[in-house]
C-alpha cells in the first residue's frame, strides 16, 4: 500500500501538518512519501521540512484522476511545465491511478473529525482516510532522490557605465556627495546587489513615464544616496542626516528591502507594463480563518458536537489555509523565465508559492504597494510643494487633520497640538512619536518639555531636543563611541531582538570608547540608550512619509473646497468619515445642506458658502442611479422621479426623501413621504385585493425628533439641527469633531441619544434630559459630564504658565498659574487637552 499525502493547500479537507508527518514517517521507519495536490502551493514547505528531517520528499501532481510523480529535479520541472500548460503531454514519468494509492488527509484518528469538518465547509462529502498502518516506501519503489527547489533568479543587468552615470549626477552636489556615493556603490557591488537596485530604478522610471505618481520613498532605502540619485527616492539622505548602514552594510546577507509606493488605482497598469520588459510574476498568499470566525463555523456546521470535540477540532484546524489569494504588494521581476508553478490572472502569472517559499528557493520579490493617498494627491495635479509654508504647519499644529495622511486619529491630533511642528524635521519627529510604544512611554511629553534630558544628549541630538526618537540616533551614538557603521547597525538589531550575546561585546566596546572620550557617565549613557531603543523608529521612513503627510496638509490648507470634494469622492461609503467632514465644513463657516435631487450629483457641490452633499451619501444610491437622475433633471416631484427613472426601488426613493433630497420641492418631508405612499403600484394593490388581503397605507407622520433619526437611517449620520440653542457661549459640536478635542458644549436634546447645539447635530452614547444643558463632549461621541445651564454658567480651565491659548466662547475662562498668582483670560481656552476644569455656578 502506497500512501499519497494531500496537503491543506488543496482545500479539500486535509489537516496534515508536515512537521508531524515527518515525525510519523521516522517512527514508521519510512524515508519518503508522496505529496500530490492539485497545485504546488505546499511544494516548498513540504520539500524543506522533509529534507530537514533527512527524508526524501517525493513531489507529485494530482490531475484528471491520476497522480504524476517526479523522481528527481528534472522530472519536477517537467511536472511544473505540464501544470502551467506549457506542454500538453508528459512522458517518461511514473503515473498512478487514484485507486492505486491511499489518499491521506489526516495523520491519526484524533484528527478524523477535523478533516470531515473541513470537507463540509468546502462542500464535499465525508469520505476521508488517514495514514495506513502498513505501507511501502515510495522512494525504494521509484528510485526517487532528494533535491531542493531552488531556482536561478537573475535581476535585469544594469549597463556597464551605470556607476559612472550616478557619479556624474553627484558631481554638481559636491565632494561630500561624491565620496558617500562611491562608498555606497562599493558596498552594493561587493554584496552583489547592483542588479536588484537597478531593477527597482527601472520600476520607478517606467511608472513615472506612465504618469503614475510614485511615493517619495519608504523604509530604510531612503537612507541611500544611490537610491536618491537613481530617482527611487526623493529625499536627500545627506540633507536629513540619514544613514546608509541602516539600509545596507557589509554583514547583511539577505538583499536589502526597497519597497515602492504608487497610486493604488494604477498599480495593475504598472505591473502589466513591466511585464512587457521583464519576466513578471505576482505572489500567492493564503487566508486563514480568524479565531472567532472558526469557532462560529464549528458551532454552525457541528451544532450537536460536544464541547470537547469542538475544542479538539479547533486545535487541529486553527491556522490552516482556508483560501488562496494574491499578495497585495509582492512582485517577482526577473531577467529570465523562472521554472515556477503558476496560474494566470489578467495576463500576469501568479506563482503558487508565497513570499516565504520564494525566499527559501532564492527568489527575491519587490514590493510595489498601492497607496490611496498618492491617488488622492495626484488628482490635484500639483507636483511642486513649498515645504516651509506657515499656513500648512498651522493647520497641522491645530490638529485639524481630517484627511491628512497618518494624522487623522485622535491620538495623532492631540500629538499635533503638543508638538506643533514648524518644519519638516519636526513633522518627521511627530510621525515617529505617533505610535503606541512612544506614547505609552511618554516620549512625546519628554520631547515637548526636555528640561530633564541630560546635557550630553541635548548637545548630540539637538533636532530631537536630546530625546532618542530614531534608530539612526542609536547608531550615531554607537559610531561616536567608536563602533563602525556596520557594528552600529548590528547593535541596533541586536537590541531590538534582545540578542544579548551580540549586544554585550558591542556595548562593552561602546563603554570603552565613551570613557576614552572623557565621558565619565558612560554607564548612564548606555542605560538611557537601552531604555529608549525599543521605542526608536526608522528615521528614513519617517522623513519620507512626512513628505506625503505635508503634501496632503498643504492641499487642505490651500485648496479646501477641492480637498473636500475629493475627500467625499474617496470616502462616500464611509458614513463616519462623511460625518466628520460635515463637521469640519461647518467649522469653516459653510452651510451644509442635505443632498438635493436637482443640484447634487456624485460629488460635493459648492455654491458660495452653501454646500450640498452628494446623492451618493444616501444608502442604496450608486453612481449609475445618479447618472440617470442627472439625465432627467429638473425633477419636480417624487412621482416624476418614479415615472422617469425606471427600476428605482421604493426604499431608495424613501431614503432620498428622509435624507432631505426633496426638501426644496415640498414644505416638509412628511408631504413627500405621503406622495410616495400614494404611489404604491396599482396592480400590486389589485392583486392583493383579489386574494382578500387588507391593504393599509403606510403612516408618514414625522415628529421633529424623527428627522435626525431618519437621516441617520438613510445616510448613516444625523445632519439637520432642528432646535435653536444659544450660540457663542461655549465650544461648538463641530469644534469637538474638527479638532478631536474634549470641550464644553451647550446642547439641547433632539431625541433619546441625539443632541444639537443649534448649528450641528450628533449622536451621543449618553441619554440627555430634555432642555438645554452644558456638556463636556468627547470626539468619541461620549458625554463625560452634564450640568444644568443658566446664563451665568461659566466653564473654567486651569493650566500652568506654559500653555498656549486660543480664542473660545465668551463663557469660557482660562486661569493660568504664573509665579504663584492666577491670571484669568476670559473668552480663551488652552490649545491642548491637559487641563483641570470646574463649572461655576453649579
Swiss-Prot record:
EC number: 2.7.7.7
Quaternary data: DNA polymerase III contains a core (composed of alpha, epsilon and theta chains) that associates with a tau subunit. This core dimerizes to form the PolIII' complex. PolIII' associates with the gamma complex (composed of gamma, delta, delta', psi and chi chains) and with the beta chain to form the complete DNA polymerase III complex.
Protein name: DNA polymerase III subunit alpha
InterPro entries per the UniProt record, alphabetical: DNA_pol3_alpha_NTPase_dom, DNA_pol3_finger, DnaE2/DnaE/PolC, DNAPol_HHH, Pol/His_phosphatase_N
UniProt function note: DNA polymerase III is a complex, multichain enzyme responsible for most of the replicative synthesis in bacteria. This DNA polymerase also exhibits 3' to 5' exonuclease activity. The alpha chain is the DNA polymerase.
Family named by the database record: Belongs to the DNA polymerase type-C family. DnaE subfamily.
Keywords assigned: Cytoplasm, DNA replication, DNA-directed DNA polymerase, Nucleotidyltransferase, Transferase
Subcellular location, record wording: Cytoplasm
UniProt entry tagged with the keyword Cytoplasm: yes
One of the GO BP terms on file: DNA replication
Single GO MF descriptor: DNA-directed DNA polymerase activity
Amino acid at each position: 500500500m502506497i500512501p499519497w499525502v494531500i496537503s491543506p493547500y488543496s482545500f479539500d479537507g486535509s489537516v496534515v501538518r508536515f512537521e508531524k508527518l515527518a515525525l510519523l514517517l521516522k517512527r514508521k521507519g519510512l524515508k519518503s512519501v508522496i505529496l500530490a495536490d492539485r497545485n504546488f502551493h505546499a511544494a516548498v514547505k513540504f520539500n524543506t521540512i522533509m529534507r530537514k528531517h533527512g527524508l526524501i520528499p517525493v513531489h507529485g501532481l494530482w490531475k484528471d484522476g491520476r497522480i504524476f510523480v517526479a523522481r528527481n529535479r528534472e522530472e519536477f520541472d517537467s511536472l511544473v511545465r505540464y501544470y502551467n500548460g506549457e506542454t500538453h503531454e508528459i512522458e517518461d514519468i511514473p503515473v498512478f491511478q487514484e485507486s492505486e494509492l491511499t489518499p491521506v488527509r489526516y495523520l491519526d484518528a484524533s484528527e478524523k473529525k477535523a478533516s470531515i469538518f473541513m470537507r463540509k465547509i468546502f462542500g464535499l462529502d465525508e469520505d476521508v482516510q488517514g495514514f495506513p498502518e502498513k505501507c511501502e516506501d515510495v522512494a525504494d519503489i521509484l528510485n526517487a532522490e532528494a533535491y531542493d527547489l531552488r531556482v536561478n533568479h537573475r535581476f535585469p543587468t544594469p549597463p556597464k557605465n551605470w556607476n559612472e552615470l550616478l557619479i556624474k549626477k553627484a558631481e554638481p552636489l559636491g565632494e561630500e556627495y561624491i565620496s558617500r556615493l562611491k562608498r555606497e556603490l562599493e558596498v552594493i557591488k561587493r554584496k552583489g546587489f547592483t542588479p536588484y537596485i537597478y531593477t527597482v530604478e527601472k520600476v520607478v522610471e517606467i511608472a513615472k513615464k506612465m504618469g503614475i505618481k510614485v511615493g517619495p520613498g519608504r523604509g530604510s532605502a531612503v537612507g541611500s544616496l544611490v537610491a536618491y540619485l537613481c530617482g527611487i527616492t526623493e529625499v536627500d539622505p545627506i540633507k536629513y542626516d540619514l544613514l546608509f548602514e541602516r539600509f545596507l552594510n557589509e554583514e547583511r546577507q539577505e538583499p536589502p528591502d526597497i519597497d515602492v509606493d504608487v497610486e493604488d488605482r494604477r498599480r495593475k497598469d504598472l505591473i502589466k507594463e513591466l511585464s512587457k520588459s521583464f519576466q513578471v510574476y505576482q505572489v500567492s498568499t493564503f487566508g486563514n480563518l480568524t479565531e472567532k470566525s472558526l469557532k462560529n463555523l464549528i458551532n454552525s456546521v457541528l451544532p450537536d458536537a460536544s464541547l470537547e470535540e469542538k475544542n479538539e477540532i479547533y486545535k487541529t484546524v486553527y491556522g490552516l489555509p482556508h483560501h488562496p489569494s494574491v499578495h497585495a504588494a509582492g512582485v517577482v521581476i526577473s531577467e529570465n523565465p523562472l521554472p515556477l508553478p503558476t496560474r494566470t490572472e489578467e495576463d500576469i502569472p501568479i506563482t503558487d508559492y508565497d513570499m516565504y517559499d520564494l525566499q527559501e528557493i532564492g527568489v527575491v520579490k519587490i514590493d510595489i504597494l498601492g497607496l490611496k493617498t498618492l491617488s488622492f494627491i495626484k488628482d490635484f495635479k500639483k507636483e511642486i510643494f513649498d515645504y516651509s509654508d506657515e499656513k500648512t504647519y498651522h493647520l497641522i499644529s491645530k490638529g485639524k487633520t481630517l484627511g491628512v495622511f497618518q494624522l487623522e486619529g485622535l491620538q495623532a491630533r492631540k500629538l499635533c497640538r503638543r508638538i506643533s511642528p514648524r518644519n519638516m524635521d519636526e513633522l518627521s519627529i511627530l510621525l515617529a512619536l505617533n505610535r503606541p510604544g512612544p506614547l505609552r512611554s511618554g516620549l512625546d511629553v519628554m520631547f515637548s518639555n526636555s528640561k530633564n534630558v541630560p546635557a550630553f544628549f541635548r548637545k548630540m541630538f539637538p533636532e530631537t531636543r536630546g530625546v532618542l526618537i530614531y534608530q539612526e540616533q542609536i547608531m550615531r551614538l554607537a559610531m561616536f563611541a567608536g563602533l563602525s557603521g556596520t557594528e552600529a547597525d548590528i547593535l541596533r538589531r541586536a537590541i531590538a531582538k534582545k540578542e544579548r550575546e551580540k549586544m554585550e561585546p558591542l556595548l562593552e566596546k561602546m563603554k570603552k570608547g565613551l570613557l576614552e572620550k572623557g565621558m565619565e557617565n558612560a554607564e548612564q549613557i548606555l542605560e538611557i540608550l537601552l531604555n529608549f531603543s525599543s521605542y526608536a523608529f526608522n528615521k528614513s521612513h519617517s522623513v519620507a512619509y512626512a513628505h506625503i503627510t505635508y503634501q496632503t496638509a498643504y492641499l487642505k490648507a490651500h485648496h479646501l473646497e477641492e480637498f473636500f470634494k475629493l475627500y467625499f469622492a474617496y470616502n462616500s461609503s464611509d458614513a463616519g468619515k462623511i460625518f466628520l467632514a460635515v463637521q469640519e465644513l461647518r467649522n469653516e463657516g459653510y452651510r451644509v445642506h442635505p443632498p438635493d435631487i436637482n443640484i447634487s450629483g456624485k460629488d460635493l457641490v459648492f455654491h458660495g458658502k452653501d454646500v450640498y452633499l452628494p446623492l451618493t451619501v444616501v444608502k442604496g444610491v450608486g453612481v449609475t442611479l445618479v447618472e440617470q437622475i442627472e439625465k432627467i433633471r429638473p425633477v419636480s416631484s417624487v412621482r416624476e422621479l418614479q415615472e422617469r427613472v425606471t427600476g428605482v426601488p421604493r426604499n431608495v426613493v424613501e431614503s432620498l426623501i428622509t435624507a432631505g433630497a426633496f426638501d426644496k420641492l415640498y414644505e416638509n418631508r412628511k408631504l413627500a413621504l405621503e406622495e410616495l405612499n400614494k404611489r404604491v403600484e396599482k396592480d400590486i394593490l389589485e392583486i392583493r385585493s383579489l386574494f382578500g388581503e387588507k391593504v393599509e397605507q403606510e403612516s408618514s407622520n414625522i415628529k421633529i425628533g424623527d428627522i435626525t433619526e431618519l437621516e441617520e437611517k438613510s445616510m448613516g449620520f444625523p445632519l439637520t439641527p432642528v432646535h435653536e440653542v444659544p450660540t457663542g457661549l461655549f465650544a461648538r459640536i463641530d469644534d469637538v469633531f474638527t479638532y478631536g478635542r474634549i470641550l464644553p458644549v451647550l446642547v439641547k436634546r433632539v431625541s433619546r441619544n441625539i443632541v444639537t447645539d443649534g448649528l450641528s447635530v450628533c449622536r451621543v452614547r449618553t441619554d440627555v434630559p430634555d432642555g438645554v444643558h452644558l456638556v463636556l463632549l468627547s470626539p468619541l461621541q461620549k458625554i463625560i459630564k452634564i450640568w444644568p445651564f443658566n446664563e451665568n454658567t461659566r466653564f473654567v480651565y486651569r493650566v500652568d504658565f506654559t500653555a498656549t491659548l486660543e480664542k473660545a466662547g465668551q463663557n469660557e475662562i482660562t486661569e493660568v498659574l504664573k509665579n504663584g498668582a492666577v491670571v484669568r483670560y476670559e473668552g480663551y481656552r488652552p490649545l491642548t487637552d491637559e487641563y483641570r476644569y470646574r463649572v461655576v455656578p453649579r
